[in-house]
Amino acid sequence: MVESKIIKLLEQVQSADPNSRIQAELGLRDLEKYHDFAAKLTDIASSGASVPLRQGSLIYLQRYIVHHWSPLFEQFQDGPIPDENVKKHVRETLLHLLVSLDNFTLIKAVAYAVSLIANVDYPDEWPEVVPAVLHLLQSTNENSINASLDVLDELVDESLVEEQFFIIAPQLASILYQFIFSAPPNDSMRMLQARGIKLFRSCLELIEIYKETKAEHVRVFLEQILPPWMDMFSHKFEVSLVDDRQVILPDSCGYFCIMGEIAMTLTKLRELFPSKLTPYVVTFVELVWNIIEKLLDPYIREVVFSDGLDDSAFGDKYPIRYLVELLLFVSVALQSKFVQNLFVSNTVPVPPLPPCIPLLVQYTQLPKHQIEVYESDVSEYIANEFSMDFASDTVRGAAISVLSAFEEHTTLPIQQSLREMSATYILNNEINWIYQEALLYACCSVDAASDDTYDDYLDPIYEAIKVRIDYSDAPILLLSRFFLFIGYFSESTVVASQFFQIIMNNLVNALQVDTVQYAAMKAIERFCSVGKVKPILSLQPMILEVLSQYASKSSDEALVLLVEAISSAVKLDCAKAAELGNSVIPLLFNLVATNASDPYICGIIEDTFEDIIHAANNYESMCEITLPELLQVLNQEDPIMVNIGATLLSCLIRAGPSPLPNGFVGYVLPPVYKITQIHSGDTELLQLSQEILKGLLEKDTPQLLETEISGSSGFQYILFILHQLLDKESDDSACFLVGPILLELADHASQMVDLQSILLSCIKRLAIAEQPRFIQSIIYVFAKLIVKDSLGMMHFLTSSLLNEQGLTAFEVLMTVWCDNFVYFSNFKNISIICIAMTKIYSFDSPLLDSVQVKGELISHSNRIITRSQSKLHPEEYSYVSVGEKILRLLSEEFVSLSKDAIVEEVSDDGADDWDDGPISAETFGLSANDVNELSKDEFSGVDNSEDEDNTDLQFYLLEFFKEAMKSNLHNINEVVFRLPQEEQDALVQIKEK
């Protein structure tokens, strides 16, 4: 009955009527409550029903698995988990389908369902799945092999832990090797072999994770498998792809894909285990370079000069991305000293230019289809060609990467040669303009990638360009490249300035095509920002006037370029631009208003606006121009526009004098208050409001606190805003500057009682806060106040009740303080926080013994667990008194400060035969966000000039422990022996001195 209902609903799901589909989907979800729903779906999939119906059953089975099979799935929903009998039936049926099906679509769906279940059930509940899948890999059926690779890809990428991996890996590597080593009967099977190489690469990536914890296992595994794999890779590279006429052989796409996957694997091996690649790298580079040479003619013929519309493949459907990978491998391999010697003769003082350089320039030529795109879409041209940060995911970019590697790692005169070739070939009518453009592009890109400044051999190129421009015979993209070249090297030679008027003429020429005009605009932007000889200041108004005419016609990348150019022109002389305020400021406001949702454009305009204000000779005059417009924007309903207005107001304050003009605060504070009321759910606007308040405090605290607005003081306005921020149910980031603002207020509040209410709001917020940075900022406020007046603050905290049950502010504060101590950073902050903790410990209150906080972790495992597993098995802690916890934290900090710095020697995997590659934050396990967080100055703008900020914390703690143990403060001498051994020893040593 249930099965027939499921079949009917699956049929309706495929109905053309959307209402029928929705009702059927709801019906299927309702049936998920039946314990055997998954079994029924697999039965339908294995039946003789139509393929669409069976496919639909497998799709719903996949959905059911992630929602109901196991709590380990992130998308798991409450509901009945199928019992073991149902699970066993589903697993067995799916494995049978994996072996018996011959329909590609169904096999893909089955393989995905198998991989999902295997992710959570292997090996404990489903040990037979991997042997079965490995057996499939040894079959001759392409669908079966595809299915096997699908499952293995998922297992290796998602679920294998180290114990399982080192059991499976040797067998997997052996079977994969045999599969890839064999000579397949057709090209489609070779495509599957390429997939197998990708799987092998995933195994290498997984091994790298374990090379610290399982170093010996990793060493043995690599030493056993790599030699035969490397030998096999060499043989695969030796296969010929083209015939004697340089025509790509039919049915060779699979071979090419294999070569591309091998290149990617070798690049990954260089990244993970460079010493393992060293013995083979020269052989591989010779083989790969031979392939690159042989593919040049087909690439030029079928991509660069072809009318074909497919820009992702060439030849016999060769994926271009694999040609990119072959080039990138050579680029990486050039870090090897042995590879460098392949191309450079050490016996010749100045080595001759090898033929590889002109070859690589040919690979940088623009394909015909790309030229057509660029000539019709200026934004696409700007996005891809105006930045010299070449995209290495294209053949053009990958070839530049190899040229740059030659420049960086060899003594070959790459830049000199490229420039000499350019000067010669630009005037040679027999050289195709596409090659001329490629040479100039290579000159700029290789220079941009180089860390060294090289300004020679440019003048002859400029002379050649001048001749071509005078003849007016350059095609559109070549003329554009002329201007880009001139602009790029304007910081290297004064000769570039001779072209300024020519470029301006093209910019104002209404008949000139967009591509050339925006290339001219980019050149002007470079002249203004980095030019060795910048345009004379008298030209600034004219440049800005010309650029302003493009405001209405620019969009997308062209608009970004326009804003960058305007910004650069303004910064020629910000003070002079300020004098043009009646024209420049409205232009900036118009651009920001029409592009309010573009953060990059808004950011540039905000910076430019701030620079103008900062340089203005008359700040009050600038306020008269800008404030009315800003307040008009702030009163709009659109939060995006309000955001822009608030940001610009913050810029205006930041660039202003100290103190601010009279009446300034009274003019801007009401709109800021209004923002916090009307847009109370907009985190970003609330943050901007706090930035404005903080800016006003930094610039003119007296005016802010004394200003009377509708019967309330500025001080009361701020307190009310802070109360609103702390009391509302929002993300902690909405209050991110409350702490720094409070510190400023604390320094100016006439009596402590003025802040008691807001401090209690802070403590209530701490009880539910989650973000460590916000928590630290508030704890820091209390730490500063305790250090300033420990007795008064402790009486306030211990006597203030937060609820009818008698919960004190002290209890909540110390619970959060102790639980989050591990997150506190920045030496000055930790110093103040630790000093405050010593004063709390010294306070005579029974709460130090009665208040309980988290102690040590009780239940934990050394095994890495997922977030889902941690939800199922939450960590448990012991509990200790807050007094003992303070002592424990302070002793840990003291021991940490006392230790000598240990510099760990990082292993380079014996890679001495390789030049160092670029080091990124990711090398140290840091994301870009981590780096940004670490680079922030904690609570910048807050006055940290007190003596406590400069305290030698190690010495301070030493004296504290010495005096505390002498007087046995809070039974410290007894508590010491409950501390970890290292802390115990340190404190006992202090006592004995």
Swiss-Prot record:
InterPro entries: ARM-like, ARM-type_fold, HEAT_IPO9_central, Importin-beta_N. GO terms for biological process: protein import into nucleus. Signal peptide: none annotated. Keywords: Nucleus, Protein transport, Transport. GO terms for cellular component: cytosol; nuclear envelope; nucleus. It is found in: Nucleus. SUPFAM superfamilies: ARM repeat (SSF48371). Required for nuclear protein import and mediates docking of import substrate to distinct nucleoporins. Serves a receptor for nuclear localization signals. Mediates the nuclear import of TATA-binding protein (TBP) and of histones H2A and H2B. This is Importin subunit beta-5. It comes from Schizosaccharomyces pombe (strain 972 / ATCC 24843). The lineage of its organism: Eukaryota, Fungi, Dikarya, Ascomycota, Taphrinomycotina.
